[in-house]
Regions:
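Conserved beta-strand elements of the Class I
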Residues: 12, 38-39, 154
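Nucleotide donor/acceptor-binding cores
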Residues: 9, 89, 150-152
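A structural motif shared across PLP-dependent enzymes of the aminotransferase-like
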Residues: 95-110
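Glycine-rich beta-strand-centered segment in the early N-terminal region that forms part
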Residues: 29-46, 56-99
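Basic/polar N-terminal segments that are highly enriched at the extreme N-terminus
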Residues: 1-10
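Mid-domain Rossmann-like dinucleotide-binding core that forms the NAD(H)/NADP(H) cofactor-binding site
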Residues: 127-165
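Short pre-catalytic strand/loop immediately N-terminal to key active-site residues, enriched for Gly-Thr
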Residues: 119-127
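Short N-terminal binding/cap micro-motifs at the start of the first secondary-structure element
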Residues: 18-23, 49-51
Length: 165
């Protein structure tokens, strides 16, 4: 059986809930992607309120925990069965499990999309979770009855991430 290549990356982890001082920069191993997975090297990652809620324990995570829900970067490797992404592709994601506060990671390819050429890494990383939230609010939250093209919709707290899209 061939040996699997192991590389390492730096990542932000917490061992207990707390303020920013709870975050630690550590070295962690990452391997090759398995079937249905990709390895992505981050160029930018998003910061969201849910990340703060995870860090403070408001939304508890099993500890120790990695933080971060969205990022953008370059696909380094793809696992068996992945057809929509290739090594060298620019890509972005918003996904669980948390862990985007790192230089690189292996994750499910089904959660990753190609980043269009006209979108830089910073924008790609910052818009994924907010964009999915806006799409959910528009398409899945009731009531939808009576809405038609041209109607105006008000998002409360528009100074947050969704309001800045």
């Amino acid at each position: 059986m061939p040996a699997t290549r192991s590389i390492s990356t730096r990542a932000i982890r917490i061992d207990q809930p707390g303020g920013p001082e709870a975050m630690r920069l550590i070295e962690v191993p990452i391997g090759e992607p398995g079937p249905g997975e990709i390895r992505i090297r981050h160029r930018a990652c998003g910061l969201n309120f849910i990340d703060v809620y995870h860090r403070t324990g408001l939304y508890p995570l099993p500890l120790p925990a990695s933080l971060g829900m969205e990022a953008a970067g370059i696909v380094e490797a793809v696992g068996e069965g992945v057809t929509h992404l290739h090594a060298g592709d620019r890509a972005a994601y918003a996904s669980t499990p948390p862990g985007s506060y790192c230089e690189a990671r292996v994750m499910p390819a089904k959660c990753v999309v190609k980043l269009p050429d006209g979108i830089d890494f910073e924008t790609g990383a910052a818009m994924m979770l907010k964009g999915l939230t806006a799409q959910y609010l528009l398409k899945k939250t009731l009531p939808q009855e009576g809405l038609k093209a041209g109607d105006h919709i008000l998002f409360h707290a528009a100074a947050g991430g969704v309001g800045l899209i």
